[in-house]
């Protein structure tokens, strides 16, 4: 904590997000709490039975940053196609995901409507690409950065209006 106190004394308030994902020991949890920095909540993790219920949006604290997925996850649509059927079914029921709305739009709505102070959605999820748009696969040395390979034709005026309206409807 001394490092963070010294940095704040020199630089002022720090805008740091704690990557509190994976295996967390009691000492790590204490450090996160003592730091006062927001942690991460990943919506995709909510429906993976191995992750427990802390990732379900109704369990989020307000002082957190919500992500639909991270650079190490598949895109929403990729996840919908590869996750266990029970996980996908749970996600559809919990977030009221429909094909008509678009599964990516429904999961984004869930992130943006959560109580978290901030929600971040990767561009791959916004433009609605599948696994071909995945940014990174841990331990895979091939270059991925999938969004750069996506057609610009997805970014229409109607698309921009829909994104703006969705953001406005979930801004509290």
Locate predicted features.
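Catalytic cores of glycan-processing enzymes that make or break glycosidic bonds
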Residues: 1-172
């Amino acid at each position: 904590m001394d490092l963070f106190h010294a940095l704040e004394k020199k630089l002022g308030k720090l805008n740091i997000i704690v990557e509190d994902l994976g295996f967390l020991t009691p000492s790590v949890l204490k450090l996160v709490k003592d730091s006062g920095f927001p942690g991460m909540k990943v919506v995709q993790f909510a429906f993976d039975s191995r992750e427990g219920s802390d990732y379900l949006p109704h369990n989020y604290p307000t002082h957190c940053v919500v992500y639909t997925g991270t650079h190490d996850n598949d895109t929403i649509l990729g996840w919908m196609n590869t996750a266990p059927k029970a996980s996908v079914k749970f996600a559809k029921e919990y977030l009221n995901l429909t094909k008509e709305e678009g599964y990516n739009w429904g999961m984004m709505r869930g992130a943006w409507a959560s109580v978290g102070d901030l929600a971040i959605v990767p561009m791959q999820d916004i433009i609605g690409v599948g696994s071909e748009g995945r940014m990174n696969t841990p331990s895979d040395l091939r270059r991925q950065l999938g969004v750069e390979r996506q057609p610009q034709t997805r970014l229409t005026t109607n698309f921009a209006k829909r994104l703006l309206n969705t953001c406005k409807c979930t801004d509290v």
